Amino acid sequence: KRAVKNLLAQKPIQYIIGKSFFRSLTLNVNENVLIPRPETEELVDWVVEDFRNIYPKKNIIDVGTGSGCIAISLAKELKRNIVYALDNDDAILELAKQNAKKNNVQVNFFKKDINFLNSLNLKIDVVVSNPPYVLNKEKKNMKLNVLKHEPHEAIFVNDEDPLKFYRLILDYAKLNLEKSG
């Protein structure tokens, strides 16, 4: 009865059942994190394809990990590499840690605000991220289930500075990306 009420209120089924599927993974999700999307699976495909047969092991970082879908997939599929993941919220990181454990992979999680990413001081070979990119003014075009239930800070960016997160990630990469990265 409650599930039907939630569906009628446009709550995504993934939040109602508390899980989502991403590649070969089953992930716990809640309204603190975005529901993993097929487009994000394509991002993981590109990284896996590019680094599947690369030696020696690489340090990979997922910036803004959310549910951990990217980091956990990379840890599972690129086993010999070291995967780091960061987000700025304890509850989000706890959920991502649960997902890593549930999927039997080792991911090194850090709590870090993206505005202070450079203070991480971690040399890496691969930077992966699916940062917010939808302009606030585009909210009117979004489906109600997204607007009502998914975390806006993981989707929307300030209209005046839409590339903020990309710039911060690029600044980090310029300082910390290994020459082979």
Give the ranges of each region predicted by the language model.
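Soluble or luminal CAZymes and related metallo-dependent hydrolases
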Residues: K1, N88, D161-F165
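Conserved AdoMet
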Residues: K1-D50
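S-adenosylmethionine
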Residues: Q10, I124-D125, L147
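Acidic, proline/glycine-rich intrinsically disordered inter-domain spacer in sigma factors
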Residues: L34, K58, V83, A154-D161
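Conserved SAM/SAH cofactor-binding pocket of Class I
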Residues: E39-N141
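Class I S-adenosylmethionine-dependent transferase superfamily signal
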Residues: L74, V146, I169, A173
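Mobile active-site "lid"/loop adjacent to the S-adenosyl-L-methionine
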Residues: Y133-F165
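Conserved Class I SAM-dependent methyltransferase catalytic core
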Residues: D159-G181
